[in-house]
C-alpha cells in the first residue's frame, strides 16, 4: 500500500518553481500592466482599463465609503472621477516593491508616484501611494484588487496631531 501511495504522489502534478531570473522577468510584466492601467485611466478609456483587470475585482478608494466590488460600480466610480479633471499626468514609479509567489502566479506591488491633476488651466500635484494585487491568468497578469492613498504633507499632519498648549 505504501508503495502505491509513493508512486501516485510521485506521478502527480509537480509545482513548477520559477528561477530568480524568471521571477524578475515576471515582475517587469507586472509593472507593464500597472503602466497600461495608468495610461488607460489617464486617457479615460474604460475598455483599455478593463483589459488590465481580472473578472473579479475589489478596489478601495480614497473615500472611506468607496468599496468597489463589481464592474458596474467600478465604471460608475471611474466615470464620476473622470468628470472631476481634464487630465492626469503620472510621474515615474518610485519605491517599487513587488512580492511574488515562487510559481509566478500571484503578485503584490506597492509604489509611490507623483500625479498632476489638470482642470482647465489649474494643476494640482499629489503624491500617491498605490497598492495592487495581480494574478496571472492565461499567461497574462491582471489586477484583482487595489487601493490608492493620497499622501498628506508632513506639516499638515503635524498640525493635526499636535495639541495646543494652554
Describe the residue ranges of each PLM region.
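A mature extracytoplasmic/lumenal domain signature
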Residues: 53, 63, 102, 111-113, ...
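Surface-exposed, charged secondary-structure patches
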Residues: 75-120
Amino acid at each position: 500500500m505504501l508503495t502505491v501511495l509513493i508512486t501516485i504522489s510521485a506521478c502527480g502534478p509537480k509545482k513548477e518553481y520559477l528561477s530568480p531570473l524568471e521571477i524578475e522577468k515576471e515582475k517587469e510584466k507586472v509593472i507593464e500592466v500597472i503602466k497600461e492601467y495608468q495610461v488607460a485611466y489617464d486617457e479615460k478609456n474604460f475598455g483599455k482599463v478593463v483589459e488590465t483587470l481580472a473578472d473579479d475585482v475589489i478596489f478601495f478608494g480614497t473615500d472611506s465609503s468607496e468599496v468597489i466590488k463589481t464592474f458596474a460600480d467600478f465604471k460608475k466610480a471611474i466615470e464620476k472621477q473622470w468628470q472631476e479633471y481634464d487630465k492626469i499626468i503620472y510621474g515615474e514609479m518610485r519605491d517599487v516593491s513587488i512580492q511574488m509567489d515562487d510559481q509566478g502566479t500571484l503578485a503584490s506591488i506597492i509604489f509611490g508616484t507623483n500625479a498632476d491633476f489638470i482642470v482647465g488651466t489649474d494643476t494640482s500635484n499629489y503624491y500617491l501611494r498605490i497598492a495592487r494585487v495581480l494574478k496571472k491568468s492565461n499567461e497574462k497578469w491582471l489586477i484583482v484588487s487595489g487601493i490608492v492613498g493620497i499622501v498628506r504633507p508632513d506639516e499638515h499632519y503635524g498640525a493635526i496631531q499636535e495639541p495646543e498648549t494652554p
